[in-house]
Amino acid sequence: MTHTVQAKETLFSISKKYGLTVEQLMKVNNLLSNNLFIGQNLVISLPSPVTPNVPAKPVVSSYLDTRKAFVVNKQPKGTFNNYTISFPSPNGTITTGLFRDNYPSPNRVNAKGISYTGKSLFDTNRTLFADLCQQNYYLEVLHHIAKNEGCFDAINSYDKAIFSFGFIQFTGAKASGAMLTRVLQRFKLRDEYAFNDCFTQYGINIQSDKVPIFKVATPAITLEDDAAYTEVANNLQLTGAFIASGFRRSMIRAQVEIALEEYVLKAVSPTVMLNFKGQSVPLNNVLKTEGGFALRIDLCVNRGLTGSLSVLKTAIEKVAQESGITTAVGLAKINERRVVEVLAMNETDTLKRDRTLKLLNEGFSFWK
């Protein structure tokens, strides 16, 4: 008998319907990956006719079976281990680049955590999301940020953010804003079929309440939010599911949508104000060139909106003093390139200073 794939179905859901395992379905249909398309016919090999049945709730052991699609290769190196993860894709098996645990960082709080730059590049995926950017230079700003943060499949799971993912390193921990949960919710909303294929069949899900809840199934219980992200950080097969999702169009677009909403548009909002000599001045009247907007957006991603305004105020006041600007109206003529230079000089953290200075060489216009 055969089964025709319907919308939102996955190998996991189909296998449960017929009492088979995912591996059995893949073997009899010569499938190289878990990816399906609507209308695809699958051979259902049964010893005798069976009426399809749908269990009331998924069995956690089935999640453990599907997770075996992510093959973790470990290379002990004494005080740490090197790893790669291999997983099937429509174009054949993909193997990650090399990464390690016990990551050498003063910010490390989880020895099992890793740092992985990724392979799903901004440039090669640009056509998938260019239409989302209201201004052309938003693309270049996001590209600049990606150079400092990572690819669409990048991972950081060693620091206090618990588990961070994507080209802007969206954080999982609630204390860090849980922006990754927003990305996953958007991914599921935009393309539930792809979300199920990337996550649900592996026991990873989003409960879309007023405040979305991130969930991961384990043999004992279903974990939520910080505990769930900790499980992903400590389980490289689950980490592999995130890496694989970073190659999917809908996940890439979800990342860009949230980046635009939470960082770009908030950073350049006309409601953002600067206090100068006791007077509130719209920041859009001060830093209004491409370069000025790029600086504001990059700082918002790296330090948050409040943190960005603090360092911007100090740099703007310094440049105003150098230039003899004494009024709020005069700030409109401030040298924005000089603001970037002063802000970088004020920075004691080498990485943050270098990141800011890179803006001067990205081709952004500072012409007023």
Model region roles, listed by residue range:
Residues L31-S33, L42:
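Short secondary-structure capping/turn micro-motifs that flank functional sites
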Residues N29, P52-S245, R249, A254-K368:
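Cell-wall polysaccharide-cleaving catalytic domain and substrate-binding groove, primarily
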Residues F12, E23, L142:
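Short glycine-/small-residue-rich flexible loop motifs, especially phosphate/cofactor-binding loops
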